[in-house]
């Protein structure tokens, strides 16, 4: 069960989290493997959310971890650079890794100013929410492995709210458990 929940606090600021919970009470072996890949991508991406970095850097860090994990279990093949360049991962991960968070759950604000990425600054808040979604309804790109039945129907996303500050990124939703 994938639960994407938001809330508005009394000061009008918002929170936005996603957790994936096994309906049976326990992840299958395949679900656990996918969960661990997504969790690793999220943790690595959060570490990259530093002052002066930008949302694309955070996204690309998560994307590389996802791709490496998917290659390791045989759901993607080829070099990571080629997979990214030709977007050969899009049938398994079709969105960006996060968005601004503030007075709106998907807060306003540009990610680019002309040809430059907006740098992360002290006090900014963004979400970090990588995911993997394995469907038999989305065509597998030519040259990529056919998806084994054991993986089909698995969808995992983990989202937390991250405050950019002077030292290290702070996970504001830290009190919410990860399964």
Predicted features along the sequence, with ranges:
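Active-site neighborhoods and metal-handling regions in enzymes and metal-associated proteins
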Residues: 1-177
């Amino acid at each position: 069960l994938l639960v994407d929940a938001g809330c508005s606090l009394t000061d009008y600021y918002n929170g936005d989290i996603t957790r994936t919970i096994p309906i049976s009470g326990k992840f299958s072996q395949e679900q656990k493997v996918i969960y661990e890949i997504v969790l690793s991508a999220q943790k690595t991406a959060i570490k990259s959310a530093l002052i002066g970095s930008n949302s694309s850097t955070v996204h690309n860090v998560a994307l590389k971890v996802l791709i490496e994990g998917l290659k390791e279990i045989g759901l993607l093949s080829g070099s990571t650079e080629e997979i990214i360049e030709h977007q050969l991962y899009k049938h398994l991960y079709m969105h960006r890794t996060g968005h601004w968070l503030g007075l709106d759950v998907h807060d306003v604000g540009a990610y680019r100013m002309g040809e430059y990425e907006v740098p992360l600054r002290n006090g900014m808040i963004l979400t970090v929410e990588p995911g993997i979604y394995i469907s038999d309804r989305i065509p597998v790109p030519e040259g990529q492995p056919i998806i084994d039945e054991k993986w089909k129907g698995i969808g995992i996303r983990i989202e937390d709210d991250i405050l950019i500050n002077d030292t290290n990124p702070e996970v504001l939703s830290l009190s919410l458990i990860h399964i």
